[in-house]
Amino acid sequence: GSIEIRGSEGMVMSYAKCCHPIPGDPIVGHISTGRGMVIHTEDCNNIAEIIDDPEKCVSVRWDPDVKGEFSVELRVELENQRGIIATLATTITGCEANIERISTVERDARFSIVNLSLNVRNRVHLARVLKKVRLIRSVLKVTRVKSRKVRKTIKSILGAND
């Protein structure tokens, strides 16, 4: 397995979509009714309110020999230039990371934001990808996106129907 947990043998396990934990991240296990154990990063906003509840949270750590690929979200702010998306994609795949999803938002005629979902092996692999992407001349800023406020978004959508 990819996680070492005492007393969790046979428990269904999944990775939280809010914070996308990857090997190397400090993590915590949340025992969720119907979903088994959900692994979050320790700094995830969604875990903050329940982290002190021993009934729901368990101490977990990555198996040192973890294998596989893990999803991570990136936000890249860049200057619009011909071929910049191709350059970005080539740079990322050149680091042996796979792009699952990509979307762009044009801020204005000069700047765009590119949201990416990538597969990486661990934090070291992610750091290598980030370093290479930051070397692209048109790239202004690269950030790993974690802990989108999922609940607030849902509440605002539901509230909009009143």
Description of each model-found segment:
Residues 1-75, 81-85, 100-105, 123-124, ...:
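N-terminal non-catalytic structural scaffold regions of very large proteins
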